[in-house]
Amino acid sequence: AASDVYKRQALVASFDDSLAVSDTDVDYLVVSPGSKLNINGSSSMPVIMTGASDLTGEVTDGAQSQWGGLVISGLATHNNCNEADLGTAACTAEGEGASGYYGGTDDEDNSGSMSYFQVKYAGYLFTNEDELNGIAFQAVGSGTDVSYVQVHNGSDDGIEWFGGTVGIKNFVVTGASDDSLDWTDGWRGFAQYGVVVQTLFPATDGSRSKDNTIEADNLGSDMDRAPRSFPSIANVTFVQDYGGDTLQLREGTGINLWNSIVSGNPEDSAGCVDVDDDETFRFMSEENGLSFAGTLFAVSYTHLRAHETVHY
């Protein structure tokens, strides 16, 4: 469990051409603020983080929640704290799954170097408002290097960012039961060179997942609060196969979306781009608003605001 790996003093942990296996669904790896995780896989031998059933051959195509996932917490800025504490070391927030507090003032904070690794069959539901993802980046800074990563069959989001400035390159997200990519609380990093597939997925109650390829927020309680979420997304192919939106933008988020392909199934998907509320729509033309360039939208309709649709 988290208590087995969470340390208050700064530590450095390294994985080299390794297989990390958890044998219970509540085990998860937490990197605390000030600590570093170095993953040094290779294209021929990536580091694999997975559940025990993956080794025994008992894992199924729809398996999830075989272990909790990877949580990385840093000392960068975010906006989910008391307004008086914004931009100070007192601006901290408590991570999901009792993973500890995160946040600070160093947007160049370094939580390690991670390349060529897979996170498979992860995620855990504590409550509907407290869930572990495949990977959670909590106020992680831009000094952290993340590249060549796949997250597969996460029971919540594939990758979620809570503030911070960390970027990711060369990534694949498949089989998430909630959103494939999710950000909130002032994330200002980047995601480049990726493939994201939001697939038809059977839920535990027999229903089908109708979540989004991207679910993007700033802060629900104060949509204009700085630092505002404004990541750059480039050279990514998004495929929404069923149910939800390909891009759902809400709660004041901004986005730079460049040189990408955004596709959905027009019969089964809710929308290609859904700007979900009036406040986010109003921010579209402002600095750190919404910018789309060199991007192909391959679907029959786009929601600009709730109950407003443009056909093209």
Indicate where each model-derived feature is located.
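Beta-strand repeat architectures
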Residues: 7, 11, 39-42
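Conserved small/polar residues in nucleotide/adenosyl-binding loops
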Residues: 2-9, 302-309
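Extracellular beta-rich repeat passengers
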Residues: 16-34, 41-42, 46-156, 160-308
